[in-house]
Amino acid sequence: MAESRQTRLQVKCPTCQTAVVWKPENAFRPFCSQRCKLIDLGGWADGKYTVSGQTESLPEISEPDGAYR
């Protein structure tokens, strides 16, 4: 009953734009389903999405003596 008194926050699934209630029980939030979550993950893996900013080069690490070969 307490939930009915509160305003339920709804967001749109970033993948399919379906309305999703934002609540702890929704394991896929902000997505509506596991499928939409995996589609988004695939987009990141394919380079479809990026985070803007400067690229930093990583320091070179030399192999220690007796390295795995």
Curated annotation (Swiss-Prot):
Which is one GO molecular function term here?
A: DNA topoisomerase type II (double strand cut, ATP-hydrolyzing) inhibitor activity
Pfam families in UniProt: YacG
Q: Which Gene3D superfamilies does UniProt cross-reference here? A: Erythroid Transcription Factor GATA-1, subunit A
What does the UniProt keyword field contain? Metal-binding, Zinc
**What are the required cofactors?**
Zn(2+)
Recorded family membership: Belongs to the DNA gyrase inhibitor YacG family.
Q: What does this protein do?
A: Inhibits all the catalytic activities of DNA gyrase by preventing its interaction with DNA. Acts by binding directly to the C-terminal domain of GyrB, which probably disrupts DNA binding by the gyrase.
The name this protein goes by in its record: DNA gyrase inhibitor YacG
Species in which this protein is naturally found: Neisseria gonorrhoeae (strain ATCC 700825 / FA 1090)
